[in-house]
Amino acid sequence: MKKIRIGQGFDIHPLVVGRDLIIGGVTIPYEKGLLGHSDADVLLHALCDALLGAAALGDIGRHFSDTDARYQGIDSRKLVREVHRLLTEAGYRVVNIDATIIAQVPKMAPHIPGMVTNIAQDLTLPAGDINIKAKTAEKLGVVGRGEGIVAEVVCLIADGDEV
């Protein structure tokens, strides 16, 4: 019997002056960037957690500790490719990705096509199997005040070649 598994991932990082804003592997022009040990790409971190969780392989912190100097400033696309390798090694393939970025500022919509392209390349997945939505927090809370950005990702994985 074919195994089909669902994963869910979440990440949040604060916005600070002096960092590049990188989401989905796309550098977005803005006066602030996300603070973190790596490049702080909230979307790709949530994606890694969703994929690892679906395969019962732990979470991003287990595989890429924020106390490990090897991951200081690392491009999170490298982490996604490594997670993809782990899933493949475990006998799984990614079926689809559905993601939501929650940011009051800056606007994400113009950058979504590039994010989809990057994720499709890193997971060797057709772009049509990846959906990314952008929402605001309606000026509520930390995100609504422009102090941080959140990403949530749901994924479906399956063993073998067909669902």
From Swiss-Prot:
Q: What is its EC number?
A: 4.6.1.12
Q: How is the cofactor bound?
A: Binds 1 divalent metal cation per subunit.
Cofactor(s) named in the record: a divalent metal cation
For this UniProt record, the keywords arranged alphabetically read as follows: Isoprene biosynthesis, Lyase, Metal-binding
- One record GO biological process: terpenoid biosynthetic process
Q: Does the keyword Transmembrane helix apply?
A: no
Task: Kindly list the residues the record flags as site (Transition state stabilizer).
Answer: 37, 136
Q: Which Gene3D superfamilies match?
A: 2-C-methyl-D-erythritol 2,4-cyclodiphosphate synthase (3.30.1330.50)
Q: So where does 4-CDP-2-C-methyl-D-erythritol 2-phosphate get bound?
A: 11-13, 37-38, 59-61, 64-68, 103-109, 145
Binding positions for a divalent metal cation per the UniProt entry: 11, 13, 45
Recorded catalytic reaction(s): these are: 4-CDP-2-C-methyl-D-erythritol 2-phosphate = 2-C-methyl-D-erythritol 2,4-cyclic diphosphate + CMP
- Identify the pathway: Isoprenoid biosynthesis; isopentenyl diphosphate biosynthesis via DXP pathway; isopentenyl diphosphate from 1-deoxy-D-xylulose 5-phosphate: step 4/6
Q: Which family does it belong to?
A: Belongs to the IspF family.
PANTHER family per record: 2-C-METHYL-D-ERYTHRITOL 2,4-CYCLODIPHOSPHATE SYNTHASE, CHLOROPLASTIC
Briefly state the protein's biological role: Involved in the biosynthesis of isopentenyl diphosphate (IPP) and dimethylallyl diphosphate (DMAPP), two major building blocks of isoprenoid compounds. Catalyzes the conversion of 4-diphosphocytidyl-2-C-methyl-D-erythritol 2-phosphate (CDP-ME2P) to 2-C-methyl-D-erythritol 2,4-cyclodiphosphate (ME-CPP) with a corresponding release of cytidine 5-monophosphate (CMP).
Subunit structure comment from the entry: Homotrimer.
Name of the protein this chain belongs to: 2-C-methyl-D-erythritol 2,4-cyclodiphosphate synthase
Q: Which source organism?
A: Nitrosomonas europaea (strain ATCC 19718 / CIP 103999 / KCTC 2705 / NBRC 14298)
Please name the taxonomic classification of the source.
Bacteria, Pseudomonadati, Pseudomonadota, Betaproteobacteria, Nitrosomonadales
